[in-house]
A protein has these predicted regions:
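Extracellular glycan-recognition regions
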Residues: 1-180
Length: 180
């Protein structure tokens, strides 16, 4: 990840521990706004680059998810009230492919995996006012659509990789093949 920082990428909520392509989340980190739980959190970790207009963001990652809601994947962040995160989230002991679209309040959708994935590839394609999220498992291409969502067009966003531990003490994720 050092090479990304040298090419203009930056941290939003930099974690205490990261090296190479590996990030260990800090405790009590998350991105969420209001829905169901009633709280607002803007403390998760993002390593991203500022992008305006259309783009495609793809990353492959693997994490040692341990505790409820441990999560890793991609993020597209306009501001604290407008963002998307998608990846794996550990829910009730199982890995879920997850997408949260937030426009003032968070809207969460999941697909339960029958078996834990060794790795996940997530692709977010921003075209005009739309972000399409697709995924692939265990080395497969991101060919399965998870979510099609409205997102404000043309505005510059922070786009990159994300991880967080809302409840747990932290876990480690390795990000590979990051491209935008």
């Amino acid at each position: 990840m050092e090479h990304l920082i040298k090419s203009g990428w930056r941290w939003f909520n930099e974690p205490a521990q990261w090296t190479g392509n590996t990030v260990t989340t800090d405790h009590d980190t998350d991105f969420w706004r209001t829905t169901h739980y009633g709280y607002v959190r803007d403390t998760g970790h993002i390593l991203g680059v500022d992008k305006a207009g259309d783009f495609e963001l793809t990353v492959t990652f693997a994490g040692n998810y341990r505790e409820q809601y441990d999560q890793a994947g991609i993020a597209i962040r306009l501001d604290e009230k407008n963002w998307i995160k998608s990846g794996i989230e550990l829910v009730d002991g199982g890995q879920q492919i997850s997408a949260v679209v937030t426009r003032e309040v968070s809207d969460w959708s999941v697909v339960e995996l029958a078996e834990p994935a060794a790795s996940v590839t997530i692709k977010a394609e921003r075209t005009g006012d739309t972000v399409t999220i697709s995924y692939g498992l265990n080395g497969g291409p991101p060919a399965t659509m998870l979510r099609l969502a409205y997102f404000p067009p043309e505005l510059s966003v922070l786009a990159g990789v994300m991880c967080a531990s809302p409840i747990g003490k932290g876990f480690t994720t390795r990000f590979e093949n990051i491209s935008i």
